[in-house]
């Protein structure tokens, strides 16, 4: 993901640094905005929130984003999802924007002393995808691959290739969900030494 971001951001005034949600390595009160997309369920929530708030300027924004495919709008995608659940009946989606983590995120952020003015937004959009792009997106979904195992995941990908072999464009509807929280205007976060 980072490599793709660096390529797309080539020529822009963007600096890249290594870090984790719980320890970004960013100086205290140095950012106007911090965001995390489709992965906020993986790190330690409390440690991440403290770190994001520490790195934000007073009044800065934290934004959590999920971009969830709404397969129900397309019969082909419904068939693909149903095949996946027949192939991996024990599958429990972890990274989906429809998870319990996301369902509780507004209240979890509102309950944090570091943030105020928590706002939730969502919107729908359509993305036209080639079959290869669609398959590539599935290949990037770690929780499905891990739970299915390599053999069943390979069968799943072969199934998608088979049912999309005569299709040029797949119409995929997405629900983008955003949680925005502002830090307080005054901050008492310690400076990183």
Stretches with model-predicted labels:
Residues 1-24:
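Class I SAM-dependent methyltransferase SAM/SAH-binding core
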Residues 22-34:
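A short acidic, Gly/Pro-enriched loop at the edge of an enzyme's catalytic core
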Residues 27, 101-193:
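Conserved Class I S-adenosyl-L-methionine
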Residues 33-36, 45:
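A short beta-strand submotif of the Rossmann-like class I SAM-dependent methyltransferase core
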Residues 42-55:
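A short, conserved alpha-helix within the catalytic core of class I
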Residues 53-125:
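Conserved catalytic/acceptor-binding region of the Class I
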